[in-house]
């Protein structure tokens, strides 16, 4: 193409000679073949589970990255902004326009449309479970675990009543953990199951690492706090998302179910693993093995409900384990400690009562009776009465009766109060051992609130509500009375609620200033609940009181709740944990790349998720928005890594060049078009040039041999065919001139013509101006 004076002819220039025409040319070259820069990301292989690795990632962590190169094309625009007409030749045979010599280079990247990103796909597929309606039984086939269990219990009911002996289990392993469960499952599901044994055992070992220990399980929970900074950040997230700590069993279970759902069995695999998990929970409850990966203490209401339920079950196991361990203590030893040899001489009835109480205490604190025997409250009371009868029989020969009753002896003391003494007898005030409050999950608290609200605002309803809420108060009063014989309500209030005992200085008859105290106004209200409870309370130490927390009943409620969960319910419970894990993953990956725009999006994701996940049953649309944001971040990070690999940022020998390249890559991610500093002679320009050269050489090697044989030596022919750049995908020209129009004496005005030529298209556009004065 030889540049001519098209603008002058178009505008009908009346001048001779014609004014000069300025030409700007831009050629665009497209790079699609990246050659050695292939995309290495491969989908995880579930078979690698058994080896402890999945897709090159540590098992238990979500995978990350795109399965295809997220950068599909690179567009290089070489620009000659100021050329003079008549000196440039550009045609099919020859061209003066060498891209390497162009003074300006700019680059655009074309992104792959919706690249498959592993993390986004994992979370999206897990969300789909929430929309399923099937129950676990419908998915796996009707199970009769419970029916077989009932038959076995009924068959051995009498033997359990007459021979209450704990089953000795010295070591727990994966094999005996799931052996019985697998036998029962196979009866109803056939020999094939969604998860094979290797995968299942690996997952169970990951969830329950204590099962692999050669030592007997001591039931201690293990929480890894090796990284305090990370733990602090994670605390903020799980608190905001209402999920679970990242080292907890609930969090690990969510990751396992997410991976199984995506790669191994889908919904069936999820149902299978969940059923195994529930069986494991019952096994641990029945055999007093604490659940690992759960913080000790009452349920954490900041976590998801499923995590709270597992913590509640752990609390039940702790209480049951304490009772069973207490039961192993020999009767003679415990009686010697609690009942001195000369106690019976002081009064036979007191001795008998004390022995009965001691026996009852052992029944409370150390009861094993297999798993079912304390499954209902009436069973527990009957067993306690049986022990009372046994105690009566043993002590029937002792002398004494009601007339020989001795003064009450203090029981259940924790330690002496530092300052206070009893008001009536001046004895030191002792702080009693009290029962711990019953742990509660958020759904139990809601139920309790509903019951209390239904009592209404009447006087009777208010009184009943107060009595229901004062069970713990009554227990503490009884413990206080047992620890402090001769005490009064004022003594209890001074310890339990000091602000309700008002002291003031007064002058006595002798003129001395003394302290005089009295109960507060609210304690003097008629029919005060505290006064009623104090009058009702008997001096009974905590160890002999009726339990505030029936661990057996609560454990069975939790196990029933777990067994009734459908996969959709389970996914709803665990989705906050999965999103929590996904956010932690993108934060971890972003920290390696340091992309400012991604940091901003992650903050938006956290803020959005905190609002959505704090409430039960969030809308699917809002959840999808969160997942879309996570996928967007994943794609941006994948693009950054793709560009860094292509431009070889890690191979730079000079730190300055490396920083320039990283800045260039960052701009490519965030801007539609980026200028190349130094054009073809700069560091980035040389890399781009090399990319095109490699692609051209590969294209020449792939040419058919027939074309190489047409003329001359193959090597010579190949050399003539190979150029550094392919033919331009697009040619753009802008012709500019300043011409007086429409008359020679008109004002000289700018004239512009634009043309673009591609393989499929040719466009021509002009912008011409005329002097309108006097015309």
UniProtKB/Swiss-Prot annotation:
Annotated Pfam families: Rab3-GAP_cat_C, Rab3-GTPase_cat
Location relative to the cell: Cytoplasm; Endoplasmic reticulum; Golgi apparatus, cis-Golgi network
Lineage top rank: taxon: Eukaryota
Region Disordered: start-end pairs: 324-351, 386-414
Gene Ontology MF term list: GTPase activator activity; guanyl-nucleotide exchange factor activity; small GTPase binding
GO BP terms, alphabetized: brain development; camera-type eye development; establishment of protein localization to endoplasmic reticulum membrane; excitatory postsynaptic potential; face morphogenesis; hypothalamus development; lipid droplet organization; positive regulation of autophagosome assembly
Alphabetical keyword list: Cytoplasm, Endoplasmic reticulum, Golgi apparatus, GTPase activation, Phosphoprotein
A GO term from the CC aspect: cytoplasm
Main location: cytoplasm
Modified residues (Phosphoserine): 173, 330, 373, 375, 384, 458
Family: Belongs to the Rab3-GAP catalytic subunit family.
Subunit structure as annotated in this protein's UniProt entry: The Rab3 GTPase-activating complex is a heterodimer composed of Rab3gap1 and Rab3gap2. The Rab3 GTPase-activating complex interacts with DMXL2. Interacts with LMAN1.
Purpose of the protein: Catalytic subunit of the Rab3 GTPase-activating (Rab3GAP) complex composed of RAB3GAP1 and RAB3GAP2, which has GTPase-activating protein (GAP) activity towards various Rab3 subfamily members (RAB3A, RAB3B, RAB3C and RAB3D), RAB5A and RAB43, and guanine nucleotide exchange factor (GEF) activity towards RAB18. As part of the Rab3GAP complex, acts as a GAP for Rab3 proteins by converting active RAB3-GTP to the inactive form RAB3-GDP. Rab3 proteins are involved in regulated exocytosis of neurotransmitters and hormones.
Protein name: Rab3 GTPase-activating protein catalytic subunit
């Amino acid at each position: 193409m030889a540049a001519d004076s098209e603008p002058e002819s178009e505008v009908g220039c009346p001048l001779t000679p014609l004014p000069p025409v300025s030409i700007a040319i831009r050629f665009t070259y497209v790079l699609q073949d990246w050659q050695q820069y292939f995309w290495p990301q491969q989908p995880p292989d579930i078979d690698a589970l058994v080896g402890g690795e999945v897709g090159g990632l540590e098992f238990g962590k979500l995978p990350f990255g795109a399965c295809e190169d997220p950068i599909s094309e690179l567009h290089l625009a070489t620009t000659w902004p100021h050329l003079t007409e008549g000196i440039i030749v550009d045609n099919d045979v020859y061209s003066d326009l060498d891209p390497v010599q162009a003074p300006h280079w700019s680059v655009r990247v074309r992104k792959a449309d919706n690249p498959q990103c592993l993390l986004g796909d994992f979370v999206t597929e897990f969300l789909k479970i929430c929309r399923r309606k099937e129950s676990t039984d419908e998915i796996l086939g009707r199970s009769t675990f419970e029916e077989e269990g009932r038959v076995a219990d009924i068959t051995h009911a009498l033997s359990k009543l007459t021979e209450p002996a704990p089953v000795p289990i010295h070591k727990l392993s994966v094999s005996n953990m799931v052996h019985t469960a697998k036998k029962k499952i196979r009866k109803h599901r056939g020999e094939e199951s969604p998860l094979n044994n290797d995968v299942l055992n690996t997952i169970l070992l990951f969830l329950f690492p204590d099962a692999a220990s050669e030592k007997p399980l001591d039931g201690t929970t293990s929480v890894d706090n090796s990284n305090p900074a990370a733990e602090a950040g994670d605390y903020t997230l799980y608190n905001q998302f209402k999920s679970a700590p990242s080292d907890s069993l609930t969090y690990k279970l969510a990751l396992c179910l997410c991976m199984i759902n995506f790669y191994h069995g889908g919904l069936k695999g999820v149902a299978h693993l969940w059923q195994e998990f529930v069986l494991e929970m019952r096994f641990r409850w029945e055999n007093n093995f604490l659940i690992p990966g759960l913080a000790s203490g009452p349920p954490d209401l900041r976590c998801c409900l499923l995590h709270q339920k597992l913590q509640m079950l752990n609390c039940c196991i702790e209480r049951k384990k304490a009772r069973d361990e207490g039961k192993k203590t020999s009767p003679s030893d415990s009686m010697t400690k609690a009942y001195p040899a000369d106690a019976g001489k002081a009064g036979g009835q007191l001795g008998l009562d004390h022995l009965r109480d001691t026996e009852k205490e052992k029944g409370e604190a150390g009861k094993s009776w297999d798993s079912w025997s304390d499954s209902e409250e009436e069973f527990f009371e009957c067993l306690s009465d049986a022990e009372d009868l046994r105690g009566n029989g043993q002590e029937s020969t002792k002398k004494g009766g009601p007339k020989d009753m001795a003064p009450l002896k203090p029981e259940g003391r924790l330690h002496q109060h530092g300052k206070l003494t009893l008001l009536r007898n001046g004895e030191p005030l002792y702080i009693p051992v009290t029962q711990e409050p019953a742990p509660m999950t958020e759904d139990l608290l809601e139920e309790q609130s509903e019951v209390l609200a239904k009592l209404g605002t009447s006087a009777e309803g208010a009184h009943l509500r107060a009595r229901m809420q004062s069970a713990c108060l009554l227990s503490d009063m009884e413990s206080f009375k047992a620890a402090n014989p001769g005490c009064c309500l004022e003594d209890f209030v001074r310890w339990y609620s000091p602000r309700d005992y008002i002291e003031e200085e007064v002058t006595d008859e002798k003129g001395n200033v003394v302290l005089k105290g009295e109960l507060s106004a609210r304690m003097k209200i008629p029919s005060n609940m505290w006064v009623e409870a104090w009058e009702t309370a008997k001096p009974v130490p905590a160890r002999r009181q009726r339990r505030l927390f029936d661990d057996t009943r609560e454990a069975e409620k939790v196990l029933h709740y777990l067994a009734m969960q459908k996969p959709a319910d389970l996914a709803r419970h665990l989705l906050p944990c999965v999103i929590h894990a996904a956010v932690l993953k993108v934060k971890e990956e972003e920290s390696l790349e340091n992309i400012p725009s991604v940091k901003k999006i992650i903050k938006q994701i956290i803020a959005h998720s905190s609002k959505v996940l704090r409430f039960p049953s969030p809308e699917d649309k809002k959840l999808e928005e969160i997942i879309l944001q996570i996928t967007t971040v994943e794609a941006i990070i994948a693009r950054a890594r793709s560009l860094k690999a292509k431009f070889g940022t890690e191979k730079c020998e000079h730190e300055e060049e490396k920083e320039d390249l990283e800045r260039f890559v960052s701009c490519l991610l965030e801007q539609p078009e980026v200028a190349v500093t130094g054009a073809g002679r700069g560091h980035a320009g040389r890399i781009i040039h090399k990319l095109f050269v490699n692609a051209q050489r590969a294209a020449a090697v792939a040419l058919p041999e027939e074309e190489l044989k047409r003329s001359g030596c193959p090597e010579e022919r190949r050399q003539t065919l190979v150029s550094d750049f392919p033919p331009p995908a697009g040619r753009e020209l802008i012709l500019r001139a300043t011409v007086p129009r429409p008359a020679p004496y008109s004002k000289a005005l700018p004239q512009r013509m634009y043309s673009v030529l591609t393989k499929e298209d040719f466009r021509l556009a002009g912008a011409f101006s005329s002097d309108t004065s006097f015309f």
